[in-house]
Structure formats: C-alpha cells, structure tokens
C-alpha cells in the first residue's frame, strides 16, 4: 500500500501532541453539554438528581413542554455560548488558539446548524416518550437519530474550516462520511458506546445529593471530554485528508488553515 493513508496515524499523533492543551477546551465543552440538560430538567420538573440523570430531554424540549420563558431563555443562552465556543475550539484545532468564531457569518452558520441539531434531538426525545413501553419503536427512533448524526458528523468542522453554509456543510459531511466510511463509523460508534456506558454508570451510582454526586460527574466530564477531543482530532484529520486527496469537491476554501495539520 502507498499514498496518504500511511501518514494518517502519524498525522493524528502529531496533531494530538501539538494540540494536547485543547483537551481542557474539549472537557469544558463536554461539561457544558452535560450540565445544561440536567439544569433545564430541574427547572422544569424539580426532581431529585438521580431522576434527572435518568430522564433528560434537553433544554429545547423542556422549554416547549414547560412553556417556560425562563427555560427558553436558558436554552437560547446555551445555544449562543455553545456555538461561539465550538467555533473557537474548531479553529484552534486547525490553527492558533481561539475562543471565538472568525466572524459573524461563521458564528451564524454554526448557530443555525446547532439549532437544527437541537430541534432534531428534541423531536427524537418526544418520539421516544410517545413510544412509551414499545421498545421496538424507541429503538427505531434511537437508530434513526444515530443515522442522522452520522450524516452530519463532519458538518460543524466543515462550516469552520471550509467557510460554507450549513446546508453545503451537511452535503460535504455526507461526502466525507462516504469517503471515510469505516473510520467514521468506528469513531461514532466508539464515542456513542463510551458515552452511554458513562451515563449508565453514573445513573446506577448516583443516589444522594448534588454535592455527593459532583465528584463522579466531574470524573465523567474529564474522561469523556478527553475521548471527544481525540475523536475531534481524528475526524478533522480525516476530513482534511479526504479534501486534500481530491475525494471531496470542492476543496476547502480556507486551505491555509488545513496545512497546519
């Protein structure tokens, strides 16, 4: 065998070493995504922590179900902060450290994608609730959601790196998935299974107050933040490699950022 495929592991290793400090950024983003659904569920239902951990719908679904302006405002702030920081994080993966998007257009594009993902997640949560005790229907919803996430796996990276809109990014994400089918599927499956295992372990062991559960939740955020960081690096390298080898058209317009990897 010859060609760029031989250099992919080395490229991933090089980026992981050069960008290792970004693991703390990834942990912060994971902690935000972990804490917000729990907080919105508490604002909606005021249940004990153990119950909230076992049954979180997400801030958008909670805001609609509760018809609460407070939860809606909470969701909007989360969405704005999350998109802002996510853009800075992706820019940092392919260039110097950033905490913010490159410009307003990039921010709005990423915000639109994040909103779409939240809407799909909320619809899936409601569908699972409607499925009730029918495991076949619930599993079908989960499988459909997993397929959707597989299609858009690279979309946020592409918005930032290739400077395109969300619809174009989804189309390019699908092309990237097709060009890197096996590694993309393995990464999504690994992150999903590890995340589910971590959540399941937390659900089984959290029975007390927030103060008693906090250390275990922090450990989960640190471990899964590290896992997500590694997955992000691999996915970014896979996307750039697919673009640079001509398997995607058009090539990323901001190719200068990609050369840093």
What do the predicted segments below correspond to?
Residues 1-261:
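Hydrophobic alpha-helical membrane segments
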